[in-house]
UniProtKB/Swiss-Prot annotation:
One term of GO molecular function: endonuclease activity
Natural source organism: Lactococcus lactis subsp. cremoris (strain MG1363)
Residues spanning the signal sequence: none
Lineage of the species this protein comes from: Bacteria, Bacillati, Bacillota, Bacilli, Lactobacillales
Record-stated family: Belongs to the WhiA family.
Originating gene: whiA
Gene Ontology terms: biological process: cell division; regulation of sporulation
Keywords: Cell cycle, Cell division, DNA-binding
Protein's name according to its UniProt entry: Probable cell division protein WhiA
DNA-binding residues (ranges): 269-302
Protein task: Involved in cell division and chromosome segregation.
Length: 305
């Protein structure tokens, strides 16, 4: 089951509300005439279809029919249609959509002016056409697809009412409203009543950040190891060159001693080399002596070239 499906499953366990039903009718509903006025609400999510059916019964005592058919596209998804014959006109009146469903493409004005209905409407909008990327994979993104630009921009206004900086883009004849910041996505999930999903998202975000930190730490350590290995090999090459040229015996005792220890312990760290000296020497002191050997070797090579 996808992360989006998990969120929608949780949302359908919320209480039936007019605001959620209103969004589903506005975004997924279509009016027809078959022995009178009919209303169809379509979704590809079985749980959402059942939720619509239950809300119609609980809120308006309307007994609908759920019809299932297969999509003809390559996706082969099932499509669920909640079909209302008796009471369709009365329902549209109750939802204040009787005069606007086919004419007005935005969010109804009375929704924008009611704090509680706005939250419920957002829940319905996500159930209707929402998607949430798995936070463990790829980028953070929550989106709601809209057929009409006006509706997308009205939703954007509602998002901003709740401090959420949503953006709207056009993609494949749809207007997509989306959030891309993890904190705002978590706030939205809390707002629409998906607390389990919010906690799961936050946990995945933390784990992803910890893995990223561990990878950066590992890369940093590997880079340091590589630098240390290169520096050690450079010193060994310099000492061997000086030895071939009979120059080691001309060096001060402190440099001769560190040269001997470096050759005898090629895999030792700078710290370990320092501890082998008597008296022990710190890392900066060991590095200083090894650099002197490399400089002496380079100077000799310049003279010979």
């Amino acid at each position: 089951m996808s992360f989006t499906s998990d969120v929608k499953k949780e949302l359908t366990r919320n209480l039936a509300t007019t605001g959620a039903l209103l969004a589903l009718v506005r975004m997924n509903g279509s009016v027809g005439i078959f022995n009178g006025l009919t209303l169809s609400i379509t979704t590809e999510n079985a749980g959402t279809a059942k939720y619509i059916y239950q809300m119609l019964q609980e809120l308006y005592e309307i007994h609908a029919e759920i019809r299932v058919h297969q999509k003809t596209t390559l996706s082969k998804n099932r499509v669920y249609t909640v079909f209302i014959t008796e009471g369709a006109g009365e329902l549209l009146d109750e939802l204040s959509l009787a005069d606007s469903l086919m004419l007005d493409n935005g969010v109804p004005e009375f929704v924008k002016n009611d704090e509680f209905i706005k939250k419920d409407y957002l829940r319905g909008a996500f159930l209707s056409a929402g998607a949430l990327h798995n936070p463990e994979k790829g980028e953070y993104q929550l989106s709601i697809a809209n057929v009409y630009q006006e509706h997308a921009e009205d939703l954007q206004e509602i998002f901003r009412d709740f401090g959420l900086n949503a953006r709207v883009i056009e993609r494949k004849n749809r207007w997509i409203l989306y959030l891309s910041k993890a904190e705002e996505i978590m706030d939205f999930l809390t707002l629409i009543g998906a607390m389990k999903a919010r906690l799961k998202f936050e946990e995945a975000k933390i784990m992803r950040e910890m893995r990223g930190l561990a990878n950066r730490q590992s890369n940093f350590e590997n880079a340091n190891i590589a630098k240390s290995v290169m520096a050690a090999q450079e010193a060994i090459d310099a000492i061997q060159f000086l030895n071939e040229k009979k120059e080691l015996e001309q060096l001060p005792p402190s440099l001769k001693e560190i040269a001997r220890l470096r050759l005898e312990n090629p895999e030792a760290t700078i710290k370990e080399l320092g501890e082998l000296l008597d008296p022990p020497l710190g890392k900066s002191g060991v590095n200083h002596r090894l650099r002197k050997l490399v400089e002496r070797s380079n100077d000799l090579k310049k003279v010979e070239s």
